[in-house]
């Protein structure tokens, strides 16, 4: 699609979103066509909700988020086949894999093991591996990335190349509660088991989060080497573990106030870290 066509599509989505109270399951014509086109572009990876520039800054394509939201007003509830034991689900969003056969899977080039759930408009790049996991609509999963068992990739989240999302990891979405920007995990990151990254936070390239690290916009991220406290973004090649900051205050009963949770940057990634968190290429052959 040309830049001119994309601009026209964006304008159509923006206009429909401004008039969203009048958009419903009976809506036909330009609005429905524009939303369907936007979702198909997301599904194929030809467009993304957010894109990283050469300067490292991310640009959010808000109009694509709006297209995802409009789809909920346009689509009625329907039976979704494929449940265990021949059961069905009841939803507005079909499976990405609906109607796929062997040729389509081979063309897509990723692995999806039984009980991997991907909603339509999410993109999965070649050589990615989906264990029994959940990838929500509008998300982007990069080449060679592993989404391990019971990990969840939230709506419109951006996962880079050669990332490992360990078992039970949660990557937050943007649709509810509504966030300005998607949660982003850049290339070559390792996210430890049961960790959560939410609220549009960014984990920069090559970083490693230990098991059970929780990062939201209000989470203090403490650099142990400098004492600097930041929010919302982990610097490149950081090794981060769960920690606690002393409160320093005294409660009314005279006892020390409880320490508060924080994420601690304990060091930068080194060869020892890489040897423990490296991607196993044998799994991607």
Swiss-Prot record:
It comes from the Bacteria. The keyword Protease does not apply. Substrate binds at residues 111, 148. It catalyses: (S)-2,3,4,5-tetrahydrodipicolinate + succinyl-CoA + H2O = (S)-2-succinylamino-6-oxoheptanedioate + CoA. Keywords: Acyltransferase, Amino-acid biosynthesis, Cytoplasm, Diaminopimelate biosynthesis, Lysine biosynthesis, Repeat, Transferase. GO terms for molecular function: 2,3,4,5-tetrahydropyridine-2,6-dicarboxylate N-succinyltransferase activity. Its EC number is 2.3.1.117. Homotrimer. Belongs to the transferase hexapeptide repeat family. This is 2,3,4,5-tetrahydropyridine-2,6-dicarboxylate N-succinyltransferase. It comes from Rhizobium rhizogenes (strain K84 / ATCC BAA-868). The gene is dapD.
């Amino acid at each position: 699609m040309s830049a001119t066509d994309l601009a026209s599509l964006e304008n159509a989505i923006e206009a429909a979103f401004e008039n969203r109270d009048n958009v419903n399951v009976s809506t036909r014509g330009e609005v429905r066509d524009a939303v369907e086109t936007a979702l198909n572009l997301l599904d194929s990876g030809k467009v993304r909700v957010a894109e990283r520039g050469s300067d490292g800054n991310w640009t959010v394509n808000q109009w694509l988020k709006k297209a995802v939201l409009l789809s909920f007003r346009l689509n009625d509830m329907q039976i979704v086949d494929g449940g265990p034991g021949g059961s069905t689900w009841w939803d507005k969003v079909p499976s990405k894999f609906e109607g796929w056969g062997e040729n389509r899977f081979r063309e897509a080039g990723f692995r999806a093991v039984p009980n991997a759930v991907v909603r339509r408009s999410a993109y999965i790049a070649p050589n990615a591996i989906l264990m029994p996991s959940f990838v929500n609509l509008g998300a982007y999963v990069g080449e060679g990335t592993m989404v391990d068992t019971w990990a969840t990739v939230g709506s419109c989240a951006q996962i880079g190349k050669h990332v490992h999302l360990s078992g039970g990891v949660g990557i937050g979405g943007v649709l509810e509660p509504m966030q300005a920007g998607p949660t982003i995990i850049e290339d070559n990151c390792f996210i430890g088991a049961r960790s959560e990254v939410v609220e549009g936070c960014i984990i920069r390239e090559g970083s490693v989060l230990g098991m059970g690290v929780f990062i939201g916009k209000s989470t203090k991220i403490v650099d142990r080497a400098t004492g600097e406290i930041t929010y919302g973004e982990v610097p490149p090649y950081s090794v981060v573990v769960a920690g606690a900051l002393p409160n320093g205050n005294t409660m009314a009963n005279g006892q020390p106030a409880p320490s508060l949770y924080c994420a601690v940057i304990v060091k930068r990634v080194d060869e020892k870290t890489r040897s423990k968190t490296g991607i196993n290429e044998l799994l991607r052959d």
